[in-house]
Amino acid sequence: MTVLEIDLLDETNNLPDEDKQLVENILQFAAGYLKIEEGTELSLTFTTNEGIQEINREYRNKDQATDVISFALEEMGDGETEIDWGDFDLETPRMLGDIIISTEKAEEQAKDYGHTKARELGFLAVHGLLHLLGYDHMEPDEEKVMFGLQKEVLDAYGLER
C-alpha cells in the first residue's frame, strides 16, 4: 500500500535503481507501521558528501559532511506563530518536509559498521522520517525513544544489523 507521496531526487546521478526502490519501500513500510495518514508527502534527496556539507554549513552552521539531514515543515521556528490547520477547510495533503542523504557517507558508514549499504540507507531514511515526525535524540530519554522506534521499524521490515 502506498501511504507516502515521495518526491525523489538523485543528485549523484549514480545511485542504483534498486537502492532507490529499497529506500522508497522502507519509507512506505515505515509510514504504514507508524500510521501516517495516506497521501502525506515528503521529498527525498540523495546527494554527495560535498552536497550535504554545503547544506549543513548553510543551514546548521556545521562545515562538515554528515549522513542525513531532515527539514521538518511542521517544526516551529523561534518566534513563529502556530497555525491550527484544522480551523481551515483545506483539501491539501500533509507535507512532512525534506530528507537529504549522503550516499557517500552511507557507504562509508556501512563499511565502518560492517553491514550493507542497503541497511545503512534504510536506517538513514527511517532516521530522517522520524525527525520529520518530531522525534529527536538531543536528550538521553528522547534518544532512547527514537532509536528504539527506529530499530523496531527496521526489524519489522526485516532489515536488521
Swiss-Prot record:
GO terms for cellular component: cytoplasm
EC number in record: 3.1.-.-
UniProt-listed Pfam families: YbeY
Location(s) in or outside the cell: Cytoplasm
Binding site residues for Zn(2+): H127, H131, H137
GO BP: any one term: rRNA processing
InterPro entries in the record: MetalPrtase_cat_dom_sf_prd, YbeY, YbeY_CS
Cofactor(s) the protein needs: Zn(2+)
Mitochondrion recorded as keyword: no
Cofactor comment text: Binds 1 zinc ion.
Top class in the EC scheme: hydrolase
UniProt keyword Cytoplasm, yes or no: yes
One Gene Ontology molecular-function label: metalloendopeptidase activity
Database matches in HAMAP family: Endoribonucl_YbeY
Family label: Belongs to the endoribonuclease YbeY family.
Biological role: Single strand-specific metallo-endoribonuclease involved in late-stage 70S ribosome quality control and in maturation of the 3' terminus of the 16S rRNA.
Protein name per its UniProtKB record: Endoribonuclease YbeY
The species this protein was found in: Listeria innocua serovar 6a (strain ATCC BAA-680 / CLIP 11262)
